[in-house]
Design a protein with these regions (language model features):
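N-terminal Lys/Arg-rich, disordered targeting/topogenic segments
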Residues: 1-18
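Secreted/periplasmic serine-hydrolase-like ester/acetyl group-modifying domain
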Residues: 2, 135, 144-242
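Hydrophobic membrane-insertion alpha-helices, especially the h-region
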Residues: 19-40
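Short extracytoplasmic/periplasmic juxtamembrane "stem" segments immediately C-terminal to an N-terminal membrane anchor
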Residues: 50-68
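Membrane-embedded segments
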Residues: 70, 77, 81-165
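Residue-level recognition of beta-strand->loop/alpha-helix junctions
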Residues: 105, 249, 275-277
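Acidic-and-aromatic substrate-binding clefts and catalytic sites of carbohydrate-active enzymes
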Residues: 108-112, 223-225, 250-258
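C-terminal regions of proteins
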Residues: 260-309
Length: 309
């Protein structure tokens, strides 16, 4: 009889333990769902930048080759140099008789991020008539990637290709794939930035200046070697989906930006490379921080870009 009572108590204790474990797991799952919900739906409402990127990305997923009225479409693709250097509403108005213009700007990106995002857009059905990639030479040949943030804008196939291409380690690879599938994981850094900006409102300007440093000087031969491979793969991608590729090189303060090297390569490869403003010819007063144009500089560059496109 005591043995039966003992077994009964043990069974009750085991049941209570199982229920406790289940409650903990349910709590963890609910917490995870709440965090995902915050990341997926709240961040783009809290952050003006996140909201803009989400809106532009969604709009870029469904670009037709032509509008219902037969007008060709164009997508401008780039980073903060494009964002601040081209007055988009004015540019769109200037181009309205020729193109229906879209834009996708993701700050702190360089060639690799934008190339794989473009691949994803094409694969998901976007068919712009013209693709205009606006990147400085240093960003065209640069190897920096934004990683976790941009992973959510790339297909898993493209992300795997990027991992192999850059020989990323196992930890980084795991983080990127978590970021691809998890809204919270992909935006956790941005959430921290947003919170920091709320506490220290002036930190945005400081981080822009500190985080946007000139790339190490490259020789003409290095620029040519790297640019040629990248221009070729861009052209192959755009040709596959029937889009015309244009590279736009934005203005710089330095006269030695090797823009003419890229332009010459474009002519050799049959790619339109535009330099609306020659390097080193815009006054320093038209730049906000030595890299990005201010509103006056953007007004000048926007008009020049529209005239050559």
């Amino acid at each position: 009889m005591p043995s039966s009572i003992s077994n009964s108590k043990a069974g009750l204790q085991a049941g209570a333990t199982t229920r406790s474990i289940c409650l903990v797991l349910i709590g963890v799952a609910l917490m995870g769902a709440m965090v995902e919900g915050l990341a997926r739906f709240a961040l783009d409402r809290m952050s003006r930048i996140e909201h803009r990127i989400e809106q532009e990305y969604r709009g870029s997923l469904t670009i037709p080759a032509k509008t219902t009225s037969g007008q060709p479409t164009m997508v401008l693709l780039g980073n903060s140099i494009l964002l601040e250097g081209v007055d988009f509403p004015s540019f769109r108005s200037m181009m309205s008789s020729k193109y229906d213009v879209y834009r996708l700007v993701i700050e702190q990106t360089e060639y690799l991020d934008l190339y794989y995002i473009l691949r994803t857009l094409f694969r998901r059905g976007s068919r712009p008539h013209d693709v205009v990639l606006c990147l400085g030479v240093d960003h065209l040949v640069g190897d920096n990637i934004r990683g976790e943030f941009t992973a959510r804008y790339q297909d898993a196939t493209d992300l795997a290709d990027l991992v192999r291409r850059e020989h990323l380690d196992a930890t980084t690879t795991t983080n990127y794939f978590f970021a691809h599938w998890s809204g919270w994981f992909g935006t956790r850094t941005e959430i921290r930035k947003w919170l920091l900006a709320r506490v220290m409102p002036d930190v945005g300007g400081l981080t822009t200046v500190l985080g946007f440093r000139p790339a190490p000087a490259l020789s003409e031969s290095e620029v040519r070697l790297k640019s040629e491979a990248r221009l070729r793969e861009l052209k192959t991608l755009c040709d596959e989906y029937g889009a015309r590729l244009t590279i736009v090189i934005p203005p710089t303060l330095s006269k030695e930006d090797h823009a003419e090297v890229v332009s010459a390569l474009g002519r050799e490869l049959g790619i339109r490379v535009l330099i609306p403003v020659k390097a080193g010819t815009m006054e320093e007063s038209l730049f906000r921080d030595g890299f990005h144009l201010n509103s006056s500089g953007a007004e000048v560059f926007t008009a020049k870009l529209a005239s050559v496109l």
